[in-house]
Regions:
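Charge-dense, helix-prone N-terminal extensions
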Residues: 1-122
Length: 122
């Protein structure tokens, strides 16, 4: 999977926006982080220059199960380990499953929005 394919899939989800929140950072790695969100609630982070993993919002149960099933899934570095996972590309998780979990992260955040926000997005 390429960064273009990954980004295009993320942006194909309804009412999604992207941002480079750390673009003023002096740290080269942080400078290239693309944040994908719905209603300013993050659900995915990925480095567009060093495309080796993505960080996804996840429920604790899903996170625990994925970490047990795949070597490619770890608690997300510098994020709350109960709510975020790192998924490494080109390991034992097929790209199709990674895309499914991007969608799951999107729906996880969407379901946490207040009803009036969800109604605006419908």
């Amino acid at each position: 999977m390429s960064i273009e394919d990954f980004r295009n899939h993320c942006l194909s989800l309804k009412e999604v926006s992207e941002e480079m929140p750390f673009d003023k950072s002096k740290n080269d790695y942080a400078h290239n982080i693309l944040m994908v969100s719905i209603d300013n609630k993050w659900f995915c982070l990925v480095n567009i220059e060093v495309f080796y993993c993505c960080i996804l919002k996840s429920s604790r149960n899903v996170s625990t199960n994925l970490q047990a099933e795949y070597d490619a899934v770890h608690p997300a570095y510098h994020m709350n380990h109960r709510h975020w996972i790192s998924v490494f590309f080109n390991q034992d998780m097929p790209n199709s499953h990674i895309i499914e979990h991007v969608d799951e992260a999107y729906h996880h955040v969407l379901s946490s929005l207040p009803k009036y926000e969800c109604d605006k997005l419908a």
